[in-house]
Structures are given as C-alpha cells and as structure tokens.
Amino acid sequence: AYYLRALSNLEKEQPFFQELFGQDVSKYDVTRLKRAYNDFLLISNRFKGSKYANDAENRLVFLRNSMANHEVYIANYYLKRGAFIASSERAKYMLETYPGAPASKEALIILIESYNKLGSTNLAIESAKVLTTNFSNYTYTIDKNDLVVIKDKSVDPVVEESSFFDFGLF
C-alpha cells in the first residue's frame, strides 16, 4: 500500500506530456515529490529486504536530486531578478538539506555570485574555497573590485576555427 501511494504521488508529478517533451520536474511544485520521497523512505526503512525496498532506494536518489535541482532553480530565479539575499538563502538551504547532491556545484556558484552582488567578499571567498575543495576543476581569484572570480579549468577557451568564409570567397 505504501509503495502504491508513493508511485501515485510520483506519477502525478510526472504527467505524460512532461515525459514526452522532456520537461524537468524540478522546475515545478515539488510537493508531491516530497510526499513520494517520504513514502519511499518509509518503505526503505520499514521494509528492508522486501522486493520493493531496492526500487524505493533508487527512487529516493532520483527524488532527492530532483528536489535539490528545484532549490537551485529557485535560487537562480532569485539571482536573475536581483533578490540576492533570497538567492543566497535558497542556495544555502539546498546545500544544507541535500548535501552531496549533484546540484551542489551550481548552488555554490550561485552562492558566490550572490555574495559578490551583496558585497560580502569574505563569504564569497569561503564559498569559493568549498567549491574548489569539492570540485577540483574550479579555481578562484579575487579581482581588483574585491569580487571572487570563478574559473572552470575543464572548459577550454573558445578557439576560432578557420572556415570557407575566411578566405574572402564570400
């Protein structure tokens, strides 16, 4: 019964058109995802060894990551609209609530950018240290305006390739 309830909450959150068009469920209300998460967590904890427990644990990972992505989506929304305190609070909440989630990198970058916009250089530096410690392909520097600048070492600078049009033929 718990398993069916969890599946029901999960399926209500993933309608046919969202799956068909590849929409990200984390961009919408996650109330049902949270309910499904709690139901699958109950199954995982209470019914260890059952045929549903393994599936429940796999779905817990998906749901946790979806809810973490939702928090990052909201934090980014606030950041784009200039609500830097709200953005930083949402990113911190994501990092505290879903530690180790794949969206942690994005949350830290949002946190750094929010702190830069708020003029909180020390907090931006602390966040940059966490980012560079956990994601070794990132480095940071402090520019002349006391802003933390993040660089992803894995991204190559854009190299302009010559093309047919470069030879003056067109």
Question: What are the functions of these language-model segments?
Answer:
Residues A1-F170:
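Acidic, polar-rich low-complexity tracts and alpha-helical solenoid repeat scaffolds
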